[in-house]
Amino acid sequence: MCLETIPTNNKTLALINQGYKVLAEYQMIEQKQLKGIYAIPSYSSGLLWFGVIFIHSGLYAESVFRFSILLPDQFPEESSLPTVIFQKDIFHPHICPVSHSLDLTPLLKEWKKDQHHIWHILKYIQAIFADPEGSVCSTQNGDPIPLTEVNNMEAMRLLANNRVDFAVRAKVSILWSCQHMFDEPPIKDPHYIIFERYCPEKHQAMMERLKSRSWYELSAPKTPKPSVCVARMESARQLIEDEEAQVVNAAGSSLN
C-alpha cells in the first residue's frame, strides 16, 4: 500500500462512519413518531436535512413552516451546535429576522454526542411554537433567559407587552407559509419535501392501491444497500478534497 493513500483512506472511513451515525439519527426520529414535524437527510449530503412542521393550535395555528438543519462537518464528534434555518422570516423571539436562524442555546449550549440527538431539536422546534411565552421564560434546565440574548427583540417586546399585536405579526408569517406551500423546490434534491394540491383522481387511485394486499410490493422502491446510502452522505466539499488529494499524490508519483 502506498503511504500517500493512507490519509485519504482514513478520511473515507471517517465519512462512512459518519454516514452510519446520520442514518441512526434518522431511524431514531422514526422511532420517536413525532406528530406534525418531519425531517429527512438530503440526497446529496447527510449533513443537510430538510424539515417541515405543521402547527394546528396556538398563536401559529394553521401554519406550515419549512426549515433546514445544517450539521457540523465533524458531526456528531464536535461540540458545535447544528444550525436551523427557516425558509422565511417567522416572527418569533428565537428566530433571527435577518438570517432566519433559530437560537438553539436555550435548549443546549454545546453538542454532546452521547446525550443529544436531532430529534431533540425537532421537539424544541415544536415547543417554541406551541408555547412562545414559555420558550422565552427559561431554558430547558430552568435557567432564566436574559432578555438581551433573544434573536428578535421586537418580537420579544410585543410578546411581553402586546399579545394582540404579536398575533397580528405572527399571522403574516402564517399566511405566507400557506400561500407558498406548493412552490417549486428551491433546490433539486430528490429528498426535498414537496406538496401537491389535492387531486380527487390521484387520491382515489392511491386509496385503491392501499386496499390491495400487494400495495407495498407495487409501490415501494427497492431499498438500496447500506453502502449505497452511506455513499450518498458524503458532501460535495469532502469529495472534492479527496479528488484533489489523489491528484496531488499522482503528480508526486509521476515525478518520482
Curated annotation (Swiss-Prot):
InterPro entries: UBQ-conjugat_E2_core, UBQ-conjugating_enzyme/RWD. SMART domains: UBCc. Residues 17-179 form the UBC core domain. CDD domains: UEV_AKTIP. It comes from the Eukaryota. Belongs to the ubiquitin-conjugating enzyme family. FTS subfamily. This is Protein crossbronx-like. The lineage of its organism: Eukaryota, Metazoa, Ecdysozoa, Arthropoda, Hexapoda.
